């Protein structure tokens, strides 16, 4: 009777079991004790826009334990700028918080001339319908940029209405000048509101961490500084915004004389003056 050829796979399995015996047990890897919300709440992050969140639910507690430590981000100007929604930077070709970008929109000309149907304008506060284009908030960089960067992509690629480059008016110098004028107007308006609300223009305030000290010092080459104030109780870390680069006598009078409330300059609290401070930051960064 012919001998049957053994199945080599069965022999291999039996040999391995014989050699290793009880060591051939299935072992499950133990998961590390990870507290990062990127892992524990990954379903909330995956495929979504990542941004800083200051909601109480995010910074609060769960079962008596903090999900995230509180670094007083609500009172931090830079954290507030980073928390802005992300937009696509046409010039840099990457996604950036819109606090660091200048927005442009197209407006139909009431009286078209020379074949121009629409005009590209700068927008300080996002309002109204229509597609937008976002470019770096830097006057020096935008002066070297091509005019096409200011034109919303959807304006030229729309299936309903197509505009050729000859039909779109882009006056780059005028656009940048108007944007700067709008920011200066917003800053002046905010400072005038503070002046009307304050009982006395020289009411002194105490410095705390992440307060913003607004100065007007043309001799200081630093427009934005992060400074630790030694000698003051608590050694607070403050943000310095120097408006001296703007060369505006009205702002100089408001900051250095009429609204000065500390020996260092005009001290503003982020939570109370967030809108004004963001306009100041945008104006300084754009001017440089």
Swiss-Prot record:
Segments crossing the lipid bilayer: none
Cellular component aspect of the GO annotation: mitochondrion
Keyword Mitochondrion tagged: yes
Mitochondrion listed as a keyword: yes
Localization annotation: Mitochondrion
One record GO biological process: mitochondrial genome maintenance
Keywords linked to the UniProt accession: Mitochondrion
Pfam families (alphabetical): RRG8
Its biological purpose: Required for respiratory activity and maintenance and expression of the mitochondrial genome.
Family in the record: Belongs to the RRG8 family.
Name of the protein: Required for respiratory growth protein 8, mitochondrial
Source organism: Eremothecium gossypii (strain ATCC 10895 / CBS 109.51 / FGSC 9923 / NRRL Y-1056) (Yeast)
Gene that specifies this protein: RRG8
